[in-house]
Amino acid sequence: MALTLKAMEYFTTALRHGNIAKAAVELNIAASAISSAIDQVETEFDLTLVTRQRARGIQANASGREVARKCERLLEEYQSVLNEGAELRHALSGTLRIGYYAPIAPAFLPPI
């Protein structure tokens, strides 16, 4: 199974909060979805990336911090691509055609 952007977002949000429940509230989803995303990321890398403790929440180990850092960078780049695409949609494009009335054109246009 391939790692999804959504799983990366859930994983990094959970680590940023240090708590699955708080991440679930921020993302407006069930805590079980966050937990499943963390499992998916760990399965994809075949590593244990976080330590889960009921009283303390979750903490990333060294591998988890590295994966989270790279996931955050990838998510930021993805958002940047989306923003640039939106800007391109609103950019001017096409051919500009200029018409003129020949008898008065010399008064307004530079000589060629």
Report residues per predicted region.
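Residue cluster at the C-terminal edge of the helix-turn-helix DNA-binding motif
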Residues: 17, 26, 40-48
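A short LG(V/I)-centered, amphipathic sequence patch enriched
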Residues: 42-60
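The N-cap/first-turn positions of alpha helices
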Residues: 4-7, 31, 64
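N-terminal winged-helix
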Residues: 32, 83, 89-112
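Alpha-helical linker/hinge and terminal dimerization helices associated
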Residues: 44-45, 67-89
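Residues within the DNA-recognition helix of helix-turn-helix
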Residues: 30, 36-40, 112
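Short helix-boundary/capping micro-motifs
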Residues: 13-30
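Short alpha-helical "packing" element that flanks the helix-turn-helix/winged-helix DNA-binding module
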Residues: 10-14, 67
